[in-house]
Amino acid sequence: YRHRRKNSERKAGNISDWVMRWGGGYEAMLVLDADSIMSGSIMVEMARRLEAEPGLGLLQTLPNIVLSESLYGRLQQFANRLYGPVFANGLAAWHGYGSNFWGHNAIIRTRAFADSAHLPVLSGKPPFGGHVISHDFIEAALLRRAGWGVRFDTDLEQSYEEAPPSMSDVLIRDRRWCQGNLQHSRFLFARGLALTNRLHILSGIMAYASALFWFMLLAVGMVLTIQASFTPTDYFPEFSLFPSWPVFDSERAITLFVQSMAIVLLPKFLAWVTGILNLRRCLGYGGPLLLTISVLVEVVLSAMFAPVMMLAQSQMVREILTGSDSGWKPQRRNDG
């Protein structure tokens, strides 16, 4: 499929071409990326579950990152393996039959996909028009709109993928994902979509737009701080025997900080607890002490990387809003 006669729509075009040419002969199709793989036993189990539920249109697994060797890659792999199940089980419980599609490591009922998941060509030019770049969210939404179930089964292990080995490689991929997610705004108010799918789309948009909001918040805070340092404090703005002292609401500031940290760190804490309590998993990380040290190192490094990602993603959003198209750049898939 790298050499289709009409090589359009990239990965979505590969799937569409296969469905039109060969899909009629197969009850289901298993979608993988170039850097993902699954065990034979899991493939058989996925096919069994799909066959057992006639109303199920798509079954998504949780891919585990493997084969990372660089520091950044190992950081992603550790976070994926330890924190991933906590997030995944929460998402699966919340989504139910209205889950999402991640584009790979999933099995799809061919007839359901062919009948209901054809992607439109959006009016206008890229980055918001043209072919849909990030096809997976929209295909899941279209399947759900047609009445098919989309489910995320987190108990299906031996589902694997590789991750970009460096931050620069992640940012190259993020530029395309950012454009695809912002392009999804064209579908946010489409007729017939389920509420959960609209929330999937909105959360995907906010995954990148929030970086710009964070940057703007910091910029406004910096401007206000500079302004305050150059503005004399007026202790007597009106006639009074007593001065009017500046008010700083430290209690609310601390509350906001604690709540923000809880949102960021609580899932990681829960994952650490489950890792400690599961003896087999804990020993796989080298025991309780090494697991705890690894979590602390990951938290510190993630906090160091976060401002860099914020600036880069803010730039991505700005470029897209001003009409810059990312195209589809090749991705480095090894640590060399």
Predicted features by range, described:
Residues 96, 163-336:
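Basic/Trp-rich segment in TM-proximal cytosolic loops or flexible interdomain/linker regions
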Residues 1-191:
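Internal catalytic domains of large membrane-associated glycosyltransferases
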